[in-house]
Amino acid sequence: MRVVKGRVLDVAVDIRRGSPTFGRHVTVELTAENHRQCFIPRGFAHGFAVLSEEAVFQYKCDNLYAPQSEGAIIWNDPAIGIDWQVPAADVILSEKDQRHPTLAEAPELFDYSVDYYA
């Protein structure tokens, strides 16, 4: 994941049950100027907030899109405590993204003991 125009807060959350870092997150600011990139491994939830008026992303995936494998957690889960750097009143979400469960309520997550790259 990288940003070629604008400014984005990129977030990854460990959703591997049994992981010593389960439920913890990391954030990194990606901009066209800082040239940072972020790798989101399997077993991590990914989200972002656009911090500029507009942004253009480039990203690479290790597999084809598979909607049947898609899952998500709600962006503002208080147990995770992400500072999105955007006032909640200014957040724009799709209808779909408004209905996601919290991490504790999420039905199917990754298992830390499984190698998802094998």
Language model features with spans:
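Beta-rich strand-turn-strand
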Residues: 30-39, 44-49
